[in-house]
């Protein structure tokens, strides 16, 4: 476990693989008991506890009727799961380069020849010997194997390197040789909810990459490696499952949060034709003000209103939120354009806004025409589409569905999927109706995790951002959010963007 690492977290996880292949869930336990029994019998007969894999499988054959062919399978899996520890290998190469003698030691039941094959397969070719506990009936755990090594090289300074503090360092020093501790690559804190074989493989990948001593990336890159890879892989498989269930002929990945997800999907998981679509809640809701006027008020106007009560006039408010074309109508409705938001009546402003939906619709005509051409071109002849987003309320999915049915064709079947959803009643109903299918969590799926991501009670913006942003910025693009659709002079659809280019571009890139 120092020179070589495994593709699983613990050595006994190899037994779990065998249990699956044998269709015998209790094999892992039986294999451990057989080894313990073999060691006890060896100690009674010969005064030591070092056993070979043949002796372990002799017990398995006698007690559980396990054929010896499974011993060869275990050896084969050990070979297949072993990989080079790049940090130790770099040290090994340097030692060989300066003419040092390298000897490997291990407390192990595998044959010496097998261990030699495993080392050589990982690039270790120029070592002098392997001291294996089952060959000498001695072990590092009590220092006796180290003493045997000292007998071989009595006039040499020996430095022992290992990841077991007690055996590799304390016992080595007690036996008379110098020792260096190389900390175990395995995490001290494990995710117990991944306490299975898939979790073992995942943790091995993370541990063997992050914890050998060669990892030099920052916090954000590390977060992406630990979380982003496995999450994206699982989500892409989920997308294909939902697409198959819904018989989707086209997948639409929503900007900006699905920028990376679409790239990964097309590189490794592509089964359905797909496009990355330019969209935002603001842009798509303003295509259909007759449906989303109240949402527009709550999400974009009143939120800004509350943040700038004593700093913005109504005219400035409408200008900053993109509705400056409504300013001339204010005074006709007893609203002073120069009055600060704190002095204005929200109820009166809401009545004003909702009574001018026809003005909003007229203003959005050119945008609707451009958006109709844009989405119609992407959808083509598809009769069923799946819209993919990251989270949380599914607004882009539902608003785009409404626009498609209203402006393109009511016969197109639209469904959606999210990594995580909110826990609102509306979202729960959409999930129960199988219109939106969440991946990781939602009101009807992994509800404990959903409650963590969407905590009840009043929370600050920062608290919510700390829950949601680490998920979103792993996948998002670096571009500013979309404001509007329009057509160029040559009738090509183009986009108006906000000036809010992300401030954390370096973190996003990491």
Describe the role of every protein-language-model region.
Residues 216, 220-224, 228-235, 286-299, ...:
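Long, contiguous domain-sized segments
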Residues 164-179:
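Acidic, divalent-metal-coordinating active-site segment for phosphoryl/phosphodiester hydrolysis
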Residues 103-105, 109-157:
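Substrate-recognition "cap/lid" segment bordering the active-site pocket of phosphatases
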Residues 29, 132-135, 186, 272-287:
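Conserved beta-strand -> loop -> alpha-helix junction used to position metal-binding or nucleic-acid-contacting
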Residues 2-33:
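Active-site neighborhood of HAD-like aspartate-dependent phosphohydrolases
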């Amino acid at each position: 476990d120092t020179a070589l690492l495994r593709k699983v977290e613990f050595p006994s996880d190899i037994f779990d693989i065998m249990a699956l292949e044998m269709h015998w869930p209790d094999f892992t336990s039986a294999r451990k008991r057989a080894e313990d029994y073999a060691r006890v019998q060896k100690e009674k007969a010969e005064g030591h506890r070092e056993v070979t894999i043949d002796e372990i499988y002799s017990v398995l054959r006698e007690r559980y009727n396990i054929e010896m062919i499974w011993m060869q399978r275990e050896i084969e899996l050990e070979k297949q799961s072993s990989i080079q520890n790049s940090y130790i290998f770099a040290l090994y190469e340097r030692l060989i380069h300066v003419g040092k003698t390298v000897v490997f030691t291990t407390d192990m039941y595998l044959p010496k020849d097998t261990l030699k094959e495993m080392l050589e397969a990982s690039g270790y070719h120029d070592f002098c010997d392997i001291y294996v506990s089952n060959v000498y009936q001695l072990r590092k755990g009590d220092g006796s194997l180290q003493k045997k090594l000292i007998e071989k090289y009595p006039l040499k300074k020996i430095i022992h390197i290992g990841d077991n503090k007690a055996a590799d360092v304390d016992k080595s020093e007690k036996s008379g040789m110098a020792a260096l501790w190389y900390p175990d690559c395995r995490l001290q804190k494990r995710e117990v909810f991944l306490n299975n074989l898939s979790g073992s493989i995942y943790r091995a990948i993370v541990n063997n990459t992050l914890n050998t001593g060669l990892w030099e990336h920052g916090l954000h890159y590390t977060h992406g490696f630990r979380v982003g890879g496995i999450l994206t892989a699982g989500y892409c498989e989920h997308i294909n499952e939902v697409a198959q269930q819904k018989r989707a002929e086209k997948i639409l990945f929503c900007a900006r949060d699905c920028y990376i997800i679409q790239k990964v999907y097309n590189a490794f998981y592509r089964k359905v034709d797909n496009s990355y679509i330019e969209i935002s809640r603001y842009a798509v809701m303003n295509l259909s003000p007759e449906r989303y006027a109240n949402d527009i008020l709550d999400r974009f106007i009143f939120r800004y209103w509350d943040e700038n009560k004593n700093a913005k006039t109504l005219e400035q408010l409408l200008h900053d939120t993109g509705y400056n074309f409504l300013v001339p109508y204010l005074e006709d409705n007893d609203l002073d354009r120069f009055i600060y938001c704190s002095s204005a009546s929200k109820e009166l402003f809401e009545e004003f806004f909702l009574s001018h939906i026809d003005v909003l619709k007229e203003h959005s005509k050119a945008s609707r025409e451009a958006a109709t051409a844009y989405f119609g071109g992407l959808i083509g002849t598809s009769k069923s589409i799946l819209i993919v987003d990251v989270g949380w309320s599914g607004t882009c999915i539902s608003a785009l569905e409404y626009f498609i049915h209203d402006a393109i064709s009511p016969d197109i079947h639209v469904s959606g999927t999210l990594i995580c959803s909110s826990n609102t009643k509306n979202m729960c109903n959409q999930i129960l109706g199988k219109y939106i299918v969440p991946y990781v969590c939602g009101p009807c799926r992994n509800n404990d995790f959903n409650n963590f991501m969407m905590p009840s009670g009043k929370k600050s913006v920062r608290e919510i951002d700390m829950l949601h942003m680490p998920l979103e910025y792993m996948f998002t693009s670096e571009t500013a959010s979309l404001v509007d659709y329009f057509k160029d002079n040559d009738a090509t659809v183009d986009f108006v963007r906000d000036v809010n280019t992300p401030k954390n571009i370096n973190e996003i890139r990491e």
